[in-house]
Amino acid sequence: LLERYLETGELAEEDLTDLVRRRKLFPCLFGSALKLEGVEALLEALRRHAPLRAYPAAFGARVFKVSRDARGARLTWMKVTGGALRAKDLLTNRRPDTPEEEVWEEKADQLRLYSGEKFQPVDSAPAGTVVAVTGLSRALPGQGLGHETAWTVPALEPVLAYQMQTEADPSAALKALRLLEEEDPQLRVSWAAGAVRVQLMGEVQTEILQRRLRE
């Protein structure tokens, strides 16, 4: 590509778009959302170099986050990657190689489209939509539904194991950590010999976990 540019002094738009799509070329843009600088250039670059994805007709979704709303209801965040998800649809993790005792089937109770803290309930979410779903208790981040592969493999693995030292009831700490483990399965919370153990990336994650537990 560089040789072609040196020879002709120009590059075909199609070649640049193809390289961006294949993650071989990374455009670098500058701007400030606060000052509304460079926003139009960013949108134009997205229009030119990020062609719309063609989604399959069969339903598929990838869970990427678990959180809780102000009332404590569990929110399972997912991106629909095929077909459409409708309120009251029955979702399952069933695969040919999934042990029967690990199979779950649950109803997507409510579909929410969030904007900050506010949300709008919708009846359906087409492919390409990011939606928060209530009613699911066992879906975890990284899990695929429908035509998606069962799990995405994390790029990083925690290598530090921490044993909690607390004067409080360890069972209460375990319960709180189990809720946080739903949001981040890599915590790998375990209970052994009366002690709670978690796996973390380092001091920064340790501080974040401590703050979340205090909250």
Question: Model-flagged regions — what are they?
Answer:
Residues L1-E215:
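Structural and coupling elements of P-loop NTPases
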